[in-house]
Amino acid sequence: MKQYLDLVQSILDQGAWQENRTGVRTLSLPGAALRFDLQQGFPAVTTKKLAFKSAIGEMVGFLRATRSAAQFRALGCKVWDQNANENEQWLANPYREGPDDLGPVYGVQWRHWPAYKLLPRSAGGQVADALARGYRQVAEVAENGAPHVLLYKAVDQLRQCLDTIHQSPGDRRILFHGWNWAQIEEMALPPCHLLYQFLPNAGTREISLCLYIRSNDVGLGTPFNLTEGAALLHLVGRLTGYKPRWFSYFIGDAHVYENHLPMLREQLTREPYPAPQLVLSDRIPDFAVTGKYEPQWLEQVEPGDFTLSGYQHHAPLTAPMAV
């Protein structure tokens, strides 16, 4: 994957040293972008062995709104262990609910975003509209001396995206995100990959994805997040009857940790192999074939439903994760 190596080289050439919360310096480059045509192959790094099953396990965990490192481990992904159980700041956080807990990270926000409305009791039309939209009253409170009602519902952002792709593909507001200011302090780690926008084209029957990442560890995180984003686009396309096409990947702070430099410099000496193809299991329903809309498969997929065909790679390389 030459685009990945070009990004690494750009950071080495143009990045500036910065200190950060982990205590390991980074070479950082503000504003970076990658773009892939998924009809030409899957964006898997080939200059080292990609931890494909781990990345897919994490994605499946997100789809299931997982908040436990133990549940991620059961899906074949161990990358959350340190953040859950070894980060001193998180261990002292009053919102941590015990060993392996991560708080309402990523998928919890994707699938169960906590939405509240505080409405005047006298605003009967507003209250009725909220109730019709699935909110339920949880309390009556006084606000500025006037009676109000507090209403709540959990918003499944990702399901709403699928429903909109299915029902109104020309909509330009098909997106979800995980940056919930009200719960950031309750998370072991605030979201890095935080905004996903789907762009279906009903004429070509192709669907594209723009992903914005506020901060990306290019040595370890970028290969993971590219895998997850591209696999998610394939899955959404399968469930809605669209072919995955353009995957655009935007990074706010693209950085390389100082102790990752040997690994990345070794990769720069290696020639990338051709891109593999992602294969989805036949058990995942294909809307283009069946004509049956089955969005419940968002949480029913298993890591084994995703495989890479024709994946060639160089020898594995490792580096420590900064926590």
Swiss-Prot record:
GO terms for molecular function: thymidylate synthase activity. Its EC number is 2.1.1.45. Pfam families: Thymidylat_synt (PF00303). It comes from the Bacteria. It is an enzyme of class 2 (transferase). It catalyses: dUMP + (6R)-5,10-methylene-5,6,7,8-tetrahydrofolate = 7,8-dihydrofolate + dTMP. Belongs to the thymidylate synthase family. Bacterial-type ThyA subfamily. This is Thymidylate synthase. The lineage of its organism: Bacteria, Pseudomonadati, Pseudomonadota, Betaproteobacteria, Burkholderiales.
